Design a protein with these regions (language model features):
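A surface-exposed partner-binding patch
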Residues: 1-119, 140-178, 221-223
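Short amphipathic beta-strand/extended segments with alternating polar/hydrophobic composition
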Residues: 96-101, 122-127, 213-217
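Helix N-cap / beta->alpha transition motif
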Residues: 71-72, 100, 125-129, 206
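Extended, charged low-complexity segments
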Residues: 178-224
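Long, charged/polar, surface-exposed segments that mediate recognition or autoinhibition
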Residues: 120-146
């Protein structure tokens, strides 16, 4: 697939946001040779996803903390589907995320999710792959980053409004998993609002930034 200038800029920006969030200074990806098992089950892969694998795909905290990036070392037949290429799973496979096979040549395709046992029903989780990679990185961050609030908080609408007023909202979200997930905060932070705006969990890769957000959020909500 030929990259346009805008594709290259967008991809660089996506990866830089993830590196900043996790405090990553070096790439940690699969080699081209290691990626070959994927091409025994699909003919094409979106360049953005391929480059994610070869740039960041081996980072454990980013990709294997709460939910899991499917890797070329996995038994790929476990995730075989006639219409979808599954590349991300919930840690007990209760939820699968995939790209429609008819969209695999698309630069920035939609990402679908399925939670039914037979995985016959799929719905759009994110309108673009870029949004999904960023949203999932921020979801994993609240469990993986070194400075984190231990546990979830239940919040009421007035407290959610205070969070929205205090912190910048990030321009991506998960539409269905966990009853929706929105993200707030600065570049090193993940303030996650889950379950239709009723749950809060947060973390940062920066100690000073965490202390700043914690000073505001620690008195908001009730521990679950």
């Amino acid at each position: 697939m030929t990259k346009t200038k805008s594709n290259i800029i967008e991809e660089s920006n996506i990866f830089e946001q993830i590196r900043t969030l996790f405090g990553l200074e070096e790439d940690c990806g699969f080699t081209d040779e290691e990626m070959q098992p994927f091409f025994k089950v699909i003919e094409k892969m979106p360049t953005l996803l391929y480059n994610y694998y070869t740039t960041l795909g081996k980072h454990q905290a980013l990709n294997q903390t709460q939910d899991n990036l499917v890797t070329p070392k996995d038994n790929l037949t476990l995730f075989s589907d006639p219409n979808y290429f599954v590349f991300y799973t919930e840690n007990q496979n209760c939820c699968l995320w995939a790209i429609a096979k008819e969209d695999l040549e698309t630069a920035n395709p939609k990402v679908y999710m399925s939670t039914d046992f037979t995985h016959q029903h799929w719905q759009v989780e994110c309108d673009t792959l870029a949004d999904f990679l960023l949203a999932m990185a921020h979801l994993q961050a609240v469990f993986a980053l070194p400075y984190a609030y231990e546990g979830f908080k239940y919040i009421i609408p007035e407290e959610l409004a205070a969070i929205k007023e205090r912190f910048p909202k990030k321009p991506f979200a998960l539409h269905h998993w966990l009853e929706g997930a929105d993200f707030y905060g600065d570049a090193t932070d993940s303030i996650a609002i889950l379950d239709k705006g009723s749950q809060l969990i947060y973390a940062s890769s920066s100690k000073s930034s965490f202390e700043a957000i914690d000073s505001f959020l620690k008195d908001i909500g009730e521990d679950m």
